[in-house]
């Protein structure tokens, strides 16, 4: 998994406390790379990754390279919005 750090885009979810508390959804911006955990869509390179700040506890999914760049509380929500 070490090689992912070199080929994966460098994204980071940014937490908006108010939105996070209400809906579990916030926007992201460029940040540090972390390993992908789940939800890779082969065709367009979009994926839902776990482990981005403030998601280090693996309780949210960030859409990377898809239709949206946001944070979701479940993989299903992320996949639906991202792909």
From Swiss-Prot:
InterPro entries: Meg (IPR056205). Keywords: Disulfide bond, Signal. Coiled coil: none annotated. Pfam families: Meg. Disulfide bonds join 60-82. Expressed in endosperm, anther and pollen. It comes from the Eukaryota. Residues 1-22 form the signal peptide. Belongs to the MEG family. This is Protein MATERNALLY EXPRESSED GENE 3. It comes from Zea mays (Maize).
């Amino acid at each position: 998994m070490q090689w992912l750090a070199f080929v994966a885009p460098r994204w980071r979810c940014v937490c908006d406390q108010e939105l996070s508390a209400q809906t579990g959804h916030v926007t992201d911006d460029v940040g540090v790379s972390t390993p992908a955990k789940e939800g890779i869509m082969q065709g367009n390179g979009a994926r839902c990754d776990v482990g981005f700040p403030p998601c280090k506890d693996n309780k949210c999914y960030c859409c990377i390279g898809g239709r949206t760049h946001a944070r979701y509380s479940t993989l299903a929500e992320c996949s639906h919005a991202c792909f």
